[in-house]
Regions:
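DNA major-groove recognition helices of helix-turn-helix
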Residues: 78-92
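N-terminal interaction/assembly modules
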Residues: 1-43, 66, 70-71, 93-96
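Helix-turn-helix DNA-binding module
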Residues: 58-74
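Short amphipathic alpha-helical segments
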Residues: 32, 46-50, 80
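Short amphipathic alpha helix immediately N-terminal
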Residues: 43-62
């Protein structure tokens, strides 16, 4: 199944968030995107945050399978986590 525009947008937001932990924002949109990611992840455990960041470094199917195996999770649960955080960030950003 093809990725939705929303998934691509959240991937872009998370890539920026992961790359710049203490960012200097060039635009208001960059700031809104970074803050949405930060707020969505703020009340999660360090383990879950790290796992999500590792997922978004390379959200390919192979990476999802690898991380699921390394963390004793099913591939289904890993995809479920990815969809849940995507929805959470989209809500924080006001996209849905």
């Amino acid at each position: 199944m093809a990725k939705s525009y929303l998934s691509d947008y959240i991937q872009h937001c998370m890539s920026f968030y992961i790359r710049y932990r203490n960012p200097v924002f060039n635009t208001k949109v960059d700031e809104l995107n970074w803050n949405a990611c930060n707020n969505a992840l703020s009340n999660m455990s360090v383990y879950t945050k790290d796992l999500i960041c590792e997922l978004y470094k390379d959200a390919s199917r192979d990476n999802v399978i690898r991380l699921a195996a390394e963390n004793n999770m099913s591939e289904f649960d890993m995809w479920k986590l990815l969809r849940a955080i995507e929805k959470r960030i989209a809500k924080e950003r006001g996209l849905i």
